[in-house]
Amino acid sequence: KWLKNKEIKEENIIIYGESLGTGVATEIAQNKNFAGVILESPFTSMIDVGKTKYPFFPVRLLLKDKYESDKKIKKIKSPILIMHGEVDGIVPFWMGKKMYKLANEPKYFYFSKYDDHMMEYNEKLLNELKKFINSLN
């Protein structure tokens, strides 16, 4: 509402979510016309994350907000960049790869062999971000 009051159009906005924020970003970006979407260390669903941490616990029954991003990403029509570190100790790397696989085109990825959950904003990552943003113009 605030953006509409300021007359800022969706197509001029890039949605960026990191970790838990990727669930929110995926939710917001569905069926919208944003300039782009960037997901850093995304998860497939909170159920999947819970199962990796507590495999014998009935996670599905305990979660109110399941953030099933793997089911919602197909509804994102904007260009998307997925970034994930292979040594992420919080959100398993396979989840980022799966989210990339499920995403619609145009889609881009930056997978780092050395980054953990909080990715290092080094020159290589910044160049990938610039490349993605430049592709939106």
Can you annotate each of these PLM segments?
Residues 69, 78, 92-101:
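Short alpha-helix in the alpha/beta-hydrolase fold that links the catalytic acid
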Residues 86-91, 116-119:
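Acidic catalytic loop of the alpha/beta-hydrolase fold
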Residues 10, 34, 77-78, 105:
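Active-site acidic short loop of glycosyltransferases
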Residues 35, 42-78:
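Mobile cap/lid helix-loop segments that gate and shape the active-site cleft of serine hydrolases
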